[in-house]
Design a protein with these regions (language model features):
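C-terminal beta-strand-rich structural cap/linker in extracellular carbohydrate-active enzymes
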Residues: 78-82, 577-600
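Conserved alpha/beta catalytic core and glycan-binding cleft of carbohydrate-active enzymes
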Residues: 108, 295-297, 312-468, 496, ...
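C-terminal accessory region downstream of the catalytic core in glycan-modifying enzymes
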Residues: 471-493, 498, 550-578
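Conserved, mostly hydrophobic/aromatic
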Residues: 39, 84, 144, 174, ...
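The feature marks proteins involved in alpha-glucan
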Residues: 1-36, 63-143, 148-158, 165
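Surface-exposed beta-strand/loop patches in extracellular or lumenal glycoproteins
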Residues: 37-40, 47, 542-559
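Substrate-binding/active-site clefts of carbohydrate-active enzymes
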Residues: 105, 127-136, 145-296, 300-318
């Protein structure tokens, strides 16, 4: 039965539980199991249900006063395909997928599939009971595309690992590499593989490319049992223009703007209209759905700048409806799921993105620091002789860092579309690129902020990522790539075991530049501390010239003998961790050293 009070909340833009009202739900009526279908199509002239259970012959649905169409029948069964046949006010007939479908048949087919989500027995209670937003915990995220992380032999969809197969291989690898979380590129259903999931057709449907909803639940459950958090990439801004999905759903612009000048996105998709209350409820419900039903530990919102500014451009003015969506949705999610991370992929300089809504913020917990990423990679792509003039750009990120809670991303966006891979962006010879890659990750480790790196970065790829092939795992057969892979494991392990590198990320009193290139313009020193007094120091030489006598006594807070060497980026072996015995140290070109204060 339809709960009309919940329905009114949904239509007024106040609901985050629309998935409990709409779609196909099993109910017990007249002493038998039946399926209740409900769809919102207020401008439709007629809505009928078609599917396997009626040999695709239309069954007329009943229209309620609020514009919702309903039908209950004992005939539909789990696994049956179905659609809504909508006759518009103008007499056009369109067969539509269910906006609230929990599953969809494998592309290129587009029918919704009746799916029971109950019945999976979660075993992640211990993990959920200690789940936090990780402000004072290590947060080192491995971003991946589920369809291409590993691929099987074969053609088309046969190449994809199913969710359980992915779990078998991915979880041991993540534990081996020392990442704390994985972040999955969008898993909401989408028609085009080449969109990577960013052109969504089903906001409540886990893509059928990789298996069933219960298989996805099992992947997340197994990650949790292994101590690994799982973050979902989510697209709240736009959807596919295909007429089987949301576009002109009931013949009107139900989900998109009525004004055609405001309808199209830069990605060839259709923008949501956040002035329409039911759109707010639709997207808020989708976010709540993935957290509640699938136990995701964080949601990363894609393209937030387009919700802040019209067209994503500051020159076009604020997107007030988009801002209202962000504030109202994040406020609700923070209340309902206070331990789940809300992350903004935002390239704008809009302030208070990670401030609470009650203090005038947008209510996110973290924001990607794309400025740090661009400035750092641009510096390392600059010829050595020209880096002196780039010093201020390299240092710039710390001038604004404490305005937000930042994640430092080396994401999928930076290794596609001719941008080159992280390794290949770096200036210099083959050997110099690898030396700088080690320095980059050490610097990233020491820079305040949580960490994110895309799959393949750990292999030191030279080939850009493509969804059509897996990363170059065979690179690990080559000593230089295997050596970097091992180095990154050591670095990740160091990160997780040293609270100085994550405990006080967002408190400026626990970070200090010890050397901002004051004597040697391409040599820097950073100090990180934690609340117990542990102190780590990074010495970083980003020139191609050796510095045989770097003056430790001029830059370290204590005498050099109080420190021991923890890691050397040029050493393939564990370093001698005896206390330093000299007031100076050799710092080769394109290298870095990590020191630990003995009494810390």
């Amino acid at each position: 039965m339809i709960d009309f009070s919940l329905m009114i909340d949904y239509l007024r833009g106040r609901s985050s539980k629309g998935y409990e009202l709409f779609g196909a739900h099993f109910v017990w009526e007249n002493n038998q199991s039946q399926v209740c279908f409900a769809v919102y199509a207020p401008q439709a002239k007629v809505v009928s249900l078609i599917g396997d259970f009626n040999v695709w012959n239309p069954w007329p649905m009943q229209r309620l006063d609020c514009g919702v169409w309903v039908l209950t029948s004992p005939d539909p069964q789990p696994g049956d395909r179905y659609k809504y046949r909508i006759t518009t006010a103008g007499g056009e007939i369109w067969d539509r997928a269910d906006p609230f479908a929990f599953f969809t048949e494998l592309r290129p087919n587009t029918a919704s599939v009746i799916q029971r989500l109950d019945g999976y027995h979660w075993q992640d209670g211990a993990f959920l009971s200690t789940r936090q937003k990780n402000f004072n915990r290590p947060l080192n995220i491995y971003e991946l595309h589920a369809g291409s992380w590993r691929m099987k032999d074969g053609d088309g969809s046969e190449r994809f690992l199913q969710y359980d197969e992915l779990a078998d291989q991915l979880i041991p690898y993540i534990r081996q590499m020392g990442y704390t979380h994985i972040e999955l590129l969008p898993l909401t259903e989408y028609p085009l593989d080449a969109s990577w999931g960013y052109q969504v057709s089903g906001y409540f449907s886990a893509t059928s490319r990789y298996g069933s909803p219960h298989q996805l639940m099992a992947l997340i459950d197994r990650c949790h049992q292994a101590g690994i958090g799982v973050i979902l990439d989510f697209v709240p801004t736009h959807f596919v223009p295909d007429y089987y999905a949301l576009a002109r759903f009931d013949g009107s612009c139900l989900y998109e703007p009525d004004n055609p000048n405001l309808r199209d996105s830069p990605w060839g998709t259709v923008l949501f209209d956040f002035t329409k209350p039911h759109v707010l409820s639709f997207l808020r419900s989708a976010l709540d759905f993935w957290i509640t039903v699938y136990h995701f530990d964080g949601i990363r919102y894609d393209a937030v700048s387009n919700l802040i500014y019209q067209g994503g451009s500051k020159d076009k003015g604020l997107n007030e409806p988009g801002l209202w969506f962000l504030r109202s949705t994040n406020f609700t999610l923070q209340q309902d799921h206070p331990e789940v991370m809300l992350i903004a992929e935002d390239s704008s300089d809009y302030l208070k993105v990670t401030a609470p809504v009650v203090y005038g913020g947008l209510g996110f917990d973290y924001k990607w620091n794309l400025g740090w990423m661009h400035d750092t990679l641009d510096y390392l792509a600059t010829p050595f002789a020209e880096r002196v003039g780039m010093k201020n750009r390299f240092l710039f990120s710390m001038s604004y860092f404490y305005q937000e809670n930042y994640i430092l991303p080396l994401s999928h966006d930076e290794v596609v579309h001719g941008k080159k891979t992280i390794l290949d962006k770096l200036w210099g010879s083959y050997e110099q690129k690898f030396a700088q890659l080690r320095c980059l990750y050490c610097y990233m480790l020491f820079h305040p902020g949580k960490k994110l790196s895309f799959m393949g970065n750990e292999l030191a790829e030279f080939m850009e990522w493509s969804e059509e092939r897996q990363p170059g795992w065979n690179l690990l057969d080559y000593p230089v790539h295997r050596s970097f892979h091992t180095f990154l494991q050591r670095l990740n392990a160091l990160y997780c075991t040293c609270p100085a590198l994550w405990e006080q990320d967002f408190d400026s009193s626990y970070f200090q530049w010890l050397d901002m290139g004051s004597v040697f313009p391409e040599i820097f020193a950073i100090q990180r501390r934690d609340g117990s007094g542990q102190e780590l120091v990074l010495l970083l030489n980003l020139s191609d010239r050796d510095c045989p006598n770097y003056p430790l006594s001029a830059h370290l807070p204590a005498t050099p003998s109080a420190y021991r060497l923890l890691l050397d980026s040029q050493s393939k072996q564990e370093v001698d961790k005896e206390p330093l015995s000299s007031d100076s140290i050799s710092l080769p070109g394109l290298s870095c050293l990590i020191l630990q204060r003995e009494n810390s």
